[in-house]
């Protein structure tokens, strides 16, 4: 397994729409394993393949405190959503920035697991929010897209400044 490079906003590759996975095979399973390693190394709770410049419909999530409840979503589909909630979300592709994002309080999805077996899942609370956040990545949407243009511009400027400082270091 290896840690993959996470793309950072405003990189245009984050806006690409991910293609469905045609077959879950050893290559896809290796991508899933590398994504988990990357997510844990970056101290995240979710990661979409788009964020590591792999434009396939793959998501990994682990919202558990002990980091021992891995969830793999390949070709996820949203079946139902209900209620309203929102928390200050962060994103590995938008480092050190957080913002309140409106989300459904509960979701029901269908996806394939790491072995290509279909399953359905009902989720609420943090898991539902994380699923929605990561599914947004698969269609090129970021949490900053829910913000006002002014807030989005401020975040972009902060990240561009951080990138310049890091390039000099």
Swiss-Prot record:
Alphabetized UniProt keyword annotations: Hydrolase, Iron, Metal-binding, Protein biosynthesis
Pfam families per UniProt: Pep_deformylase
CDD domains (UniProt xref): Pep_deformylase
Record protein name field: Peptide deformylase
NCBIfam families referenced in this protein's UniProt entry, alphabetically: pept_deformyl, PRK00150.1-3
Gene: def
Taxonomic lineage of the native organism: Bacteria, Pseudomonadati, Pseudomonadota, Gammaproteobacteria, Enterobacterales
Top enzyme class: hydrolase
Disulfide bridge map: none
Coiled coil: none
Cofactors that this protein relies on: Fe(2+)
Catalyses which reaction(s): N-terminal N-formyl-L-methionyl-[peptide] + H2O = N-terminal L-methionyl-[peptide] + formate
InterPro entries noted in UniProt: Peptide_deformylase, Peptide_deformylase_sf
Catalytic machinery residues: 134
Protein family according to the UniProt entry: Belongs to the polypeptide deformylase family.
Record note on cofactor: Binds 1 Fe(2+) ion.
PANTHER family documented for this protein: PEPTIDE DEFORMYLASE
Keyword Iron set for record: yes
EC number(s) stated in the UniProt entry for this protein: 3.5.1.88
Residues that coordinate or bind Fe cation: 91, 133, 137
Function: Removes the formyl group from the N-terminal Met of newly synthesized proteins. Requires at least a dipeptide for an efficient rate of reaction. N-terminal L-methionine is a prerequisite for activity but the enzyme has broad specificity at other positions.
One function term, GO molecular function aspect: peptide deformylase activity
GO biological process, one term: co-translational protein modification
């Amino acid at each position: 397994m290896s840690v993959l490079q996470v793309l950072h906003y405003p990189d245009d590759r984050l806006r690409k729409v991910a293609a469905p996975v045609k077959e879950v095979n050893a290559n896809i399973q290796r991508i899933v394993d590398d994504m988990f390693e990357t997510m844990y190394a970056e101290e995240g709770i979710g990661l979409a393949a788009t964020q590591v410049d792999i434009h396939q419909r793959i998501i990994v999530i682990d919202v558990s405190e002990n980091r021992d409840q891995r969830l793999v979503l390949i070709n996820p589909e949203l079946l139902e959503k209900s209620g309203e909630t929102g928390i200050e979300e962060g994103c590995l592709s938008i480092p050190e920035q957080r913002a309140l994002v409106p989300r459904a309080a509960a979701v029901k999805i269908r996806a394939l697991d790491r072995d290509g077996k279909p399953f359905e899942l009902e989720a609420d609370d943090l898991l539902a929010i994380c699923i929605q956040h990561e599914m947004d990545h698969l269609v090129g949407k970021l949490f900053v897209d829910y913000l006002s243009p002014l807030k989005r511009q401020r975040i972009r400027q902060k990240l561009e400044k951080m990138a310049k400082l890091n390039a000099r270091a």
